[in-house]
Amino acid sequence: FARLALAAVGQPFAVGALARPVPLLWVAKKGETEVHLLGSFHMLKEGDYPMDPSIELAYANAEALVFEIAPAEMKSPDLSRGLMQAARFEEGGSLRAVLPEATRKKLEAFMGEAAVLGSDSMKPWFITLNMTVSMILQAGFNPALGMDVHFMQRAEADAKPTRGLETVADQIAALSGAPMDEQVL
């Protein structure tokens, strides 16, 4: 019995490299059961394909795939709706109110004053996430080419069963759960 589990390990996004990296692929065995654990990058470039042969072999031998979030949940409007709900301050809260002046000035220098004012209802973790994703996209990485999307599409085409380790709510809680003093470091 073989499974391929895709999970974000370490950095949530790829960060370009000169040499082709060794895949983050581990094998755990007990008796007849074999589980392959693959660290997944959510954004890649076309040049990152084809996948390493060890990854392709693990996929070919997998009876099922386990993702961070089940593919059906990834397609749900609850993901973006829940994320936006968690990202907004409650009535009366604002980004200006929680950011130290020096941090706000750095953010304005980076984003522009109008963009910061337009983001005033958003919590710091969400601003950080958006800035990070924006820089990764500018570097040429593409979420449609991420390993998770790649294997979700292949599993669907190959009729391989899939499931998730966490729910959308779990992911949103992990992203938004840091205390405010940690969000504004």
Language model regions located:
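Structured, acidic catalytic/metal-binding patches in enzyme active sites
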Residues: 5, 13-18, 22-185
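Bacterial N-terminal signal peptides that target proteins for export
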Residues: 1-3
